[in-house]
């Protein structure tokens, strides 16, 4: 499913509204993923604390959302634009690409909670398509 020009415009506009809360979004989304999908904790076993909102969760949540922001900036060619992140996750971190979809779902949940008036059905569809495209781009080096 490719992103239409309208999807790209919608994603860019929505990101402009929510990016100032990127750290909070990332912390909540990652916290939710670790609680609801406890199998994802295996990637973070080196952290001393995995609880919701803990310092390592906050730090990595911000890192994740910086990556989302980078993807928004490179929305016209996610595969090439995110090649370094794809290689990192595939070869160094060895993250199961199914986890990208899990985290994407949690990001959408947090958008809906934090921005109920801005996260319209139209924005939801475009952001869902964008996060799916982002997950595909990150999975590129797994092939």
Swiss-Prot record:
One of its GO terms (biological process) is hydrogen peroxide catabolic process. InterPro entries: Globin (IPR000971), Globin-like_sf (IPR009050), Globin/Proto (IPR012292), Hemoglobin_a-typ (IPR002338), Hemoglobin_oxygen_transport (IPR050056). The modification N-acetylserine is found at residue 2. SUPFAM superfamilies: Globin-like (SSF46458). It holds the Pfam family Globin. One of its GO terms (molecular function) is peroxidase activity. Red blood cells. This fish has two hemoglobins: Hb1 and Hb2. They display the Bohr and root effects. Belongs to the globin family. Hb 2 is a heterotetramer of two alpha-2 and two beta chains. Involved in oxygen transport from gills to the various peripheral tissues. This is Hemoglobin subunit alpha-2. It comes from Cottoperca gobio (Frogmouth).
């Amino acid at each position: 499913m490719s992103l239409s020009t309208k999807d790209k415009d919608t994603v860019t506009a929505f990101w402009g509204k929510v990016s100032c809360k990127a750290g909070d979004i990332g912390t909540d989304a990652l916290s939710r993923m670790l609680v609801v999908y406890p199998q994802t904790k295996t990637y973070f076993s080196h952290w001393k604390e995995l609880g919701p909102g803990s310092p390592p969760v906050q730090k990595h949540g911000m890192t994740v959302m910086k990556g989302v922001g980078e993807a928004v900036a490179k929305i016209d060619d996610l595969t090439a634009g995110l090649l370094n992140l794809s290689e990192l996750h595939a070869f160094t971190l060895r993250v199961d690409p199914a986890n990208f979809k899990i985290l994407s779902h949690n990001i959408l949940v947090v958008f809906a909670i934090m921005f109920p008036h801005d996260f319209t059905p139209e924005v939801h569809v475009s952001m869902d398509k964008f996060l799916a495209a982002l997950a595909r781009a990150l999975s590129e080096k797994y092939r």
